[in-house]
Amino acid sequence: MIQYVKRSCALGLLALASAATLAQQNPKPVDTQPVTSTHIIGAAKLIIGDVKQNQAFYEQMFGMKEVSHYSAKDVYDEPIMGFSEGARLALFSPLAEAPIKKSQFPVALIYTPDFEGVVSRIEAAKHPVTRLPTAQSGTFKIAIARDPSGNAIEIFSRPTGILEVGGSKLIVDDRQKAEDFYAKVFGAKPGQRYNTAAYDEVLMQFGAGPFLALFQPKAEAPLPKSQFPVVAIYTSDFDGVLKRVTEIGLGYRDVKSSSPDTRIIIAKDPAGNSVEIIRRAPAAAAKK
């Protein structure tokens, strides 16, 4: 795991996050990211348990603030967390789905210019966190923390940058199949690759926005997947994306939205990860 984090975070420097926001099921999604590509990673989505406990963790440890909040009675409760800029972190609490076992590997990456301050707060609060030794991290300062629901979060020091969510990380059971899926559906381009005795990973690039890491553990058996999304992707080519998702045949479901100009589907990737795909109207985006 230590070796994985070293390589993955070093790569993260090549995939700096720009502005994005999350949309969720009921209201019209709030889209604040400048248009830089057809498809954009809007948010990393974490499956959590207790909302107040997990929200407090991200507020107190990282200084994140709630920017939106969505819910559906007896189905889910979801605060949307964000920094002043960049992609969002959605804390999704299913109300009728049993807790699932979490991977030992990170599912999101956060950049910080105050690495020592952030990690020290987490240590003082007695939350699980591991600093990588210099022998493993090289010139980088890296730590892995776990939120109250057990999600592993990669913390990467970027002294000249700002606090922001740098990428979403999906655990897959076949990196090549997953890569082919995201390349075909979204035209995502593979960036850095890492293949060791412990894992096989590629970072998929979505324009100037956050990266999407596809991480295949070689010593961790595939774990159960939630029926709910673990990443949200905006697209201005919704019809084209839907056509390609349909052709691949892994299935999708429509999600109702109260806004007539918004359409959302949840598709399955080859690993069984649920992917939220949100229509981003070209005409509306052009007004930004």
Regions found by a protein language model. Give the residues of each.
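Short, charged/polar, Gly/Pro-enriched secondary-structure boundary elements
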Residues: 86-90, 100, 150-153, 209-213, ...
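Core segments of cupin and vicinal oxygen chelate
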Residues: 35-39, 45-88, 169-212, 263
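Hydrophobic h-region of N-terminal signal peptides that target proteins for export
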Residues: 14-22
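Bacterial N-terminal signal peptides that target proteins for export
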Residues: 1-12
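Vicinal oxygen chelate
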Residues: 24-37, 39-50, 69, 79-83, 87, 98-170, 191-195, ...
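Sec-exported extracytoplasmic/periplasmic mature domains
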Residues: 59-63, 114, 123-127, 173, ...
